[in-house]
A protein has these predicted regions:
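Auxiliary alpha/beta "docking" domains used to position bulky ligands
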Residues: 1-181
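Iron-sulfur cluster-binding cysteine motifs and their immediate structural context
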Residues: 187-212
Length: 213
């Protein structure tokens, strides 16, 4: 692509398609600390039964290996907060994100429309299934910060949203990360129904227990 798109142009178009948050990060290998933590997490079986998270590690740690010519990563978020709470049936309830149409299809369609509307013809659309550290790039793109719930928190939106990315082959103006605003709050830990989250006195770098989540 020869035409340089501005950061603001990208955001306006993304929000017109229903993405309530959008930011852009430069495509590089993830920092060494993150890469080391991810490998250690896998080594300690932190991913539980999610074996796919141990696949394509090189691509997960460097999006330039996932998409040749990658220069920028456009990160977007789509809200999935339900209009009403799902009633419990016995001990179980359907997770809110699983209600309705398959979100992969909906978001992929929106990503392709975003690319088309912006005149981008060389890109890779990612939504959940691609080997990319979505939360890491969302932080780099200034969407939010990683909270004590180990999820991305977007200001005024919490953590109930889907993340998706367009990896593109052009540079633009990049957003800056947001400083964590959790402070002394640990409401997520107190309200975790399965105990998957660590207590606030524990090492914050220890991931939550995926097998309990």
């Amino acid at each position: 692509m020869n035409v340089r798109l501005s950061n603001e142009t990208i955001k306006v178009e993304a929000k017109s398609l229903g993405f309530f948050a959008c930011g852009v990060a430069q495509a590089n290998r993830v920092d060494d600390v993150t890469a080391c933590k991810y490998r250690d997490w896998l080594s300690s079986s932190g991913h539980a039964s999610m074996a796919y998270l141990s696949e394509n590690i090189d691509k997960r740690l460097d999006p330039r290996l996932l998409f040749e010519g990658a220069k920028s990563i456009i990160c977007v978020a789509l809200n999935y907060t339900p209009q009403k709470k799902t009633p419990l049936k016995g001990e179980f309830a359907i997770a809110s994100y699983a209600l309705g149409q398959d979100y992969h299809d909906i978001i992929k369609s929106k990503l392709h429309r975003l690319a088309a509307n912006l005149g981008i013809d060389n890109y890779k659309a990612c939504c959940d299934t691609a080997p990319i550290l979505e939360r890491y790039w969302a932080v780099r793109a200034g969407l939010g910060w990683i909270g004590k719930n180990h999820q991305l928190i977007i200001p005024h939106a919490g953590s109930m949203f889907f993340l998706a990315e367009l990896i593109v082959d052009f540079e633009t103006d990049y957003d800056k990360p947001i400083v964590c605003r959790c402070g002394n709050c640990h409401a997520c830990i107190d309200n975790c129904p399965t105990g998957a989250l660590k207590s606030p006195d524990d090492n914050p770098d220890i991931p939550f227990d995926s097998s309990l989540c």
